[in-house]
């Protein structure tokens, strides 16, 4: 209770849920944080950050021209255990679940439209497939 924060467990659950959906393999204890106000000495939750290794983004570990389904099975979570679902379920069992996505499969083309000029078609296609797979796996995170 050093920070005085009452809802850190829910915050941690949200991080674990988001990381599971995004396949974020780079969560570590240095990017689970709180912010301290120097003037008042009070703490608040930090925005969730560092998703750079999500959706199989590491092209060295997950080359673009191979089977994404084997990659999805192979990617490991951090920092508490190597299985995303197990890690997420442990956190949500202890602290509850707050994460709910407000988009559906039919929204994906529009979400990707602004990325056409930034990424090669093969990269966008793979990200699209990964998102759809994760939507199926974690359908409970989506509001209908």
Task: Give the location of each predicted region.
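Anionic ligand-binding catalytic core segments
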Residues: 1-14, 18-24, 29, 33-144
């Amino acid at each position: 209770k050093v920070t005085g924060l009452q809802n850190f467990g829910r915050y941690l659950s949200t991080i674990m849920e988001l990381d599971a959906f995004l396949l974020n393999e780079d969560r570590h204890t240095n990017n689970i944080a709180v912010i301290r106000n120097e003037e008042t000495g009070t703490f608040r939750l930090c925005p969730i950050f560092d998703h750079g290794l999500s959706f199989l983004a590491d092209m060295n570990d997950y080359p673009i021209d191979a089977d994404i389904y084997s990659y999805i099975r192979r990617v490991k979570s951090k920092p508490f255990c190597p299985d995303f679902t197990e890690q997420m379920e442990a956190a949500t069992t202890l602290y509850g679940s707050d994460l709910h996505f407000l988009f559906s499969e039919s929204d994906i083309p529009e979400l990707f439209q602004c990325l056409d000029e930034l990424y090669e078609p093969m990269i966008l296609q793979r990200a699209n497939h990964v998102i759809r797979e994760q939507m199926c796996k974690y359908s409970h995170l989506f509001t209908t």
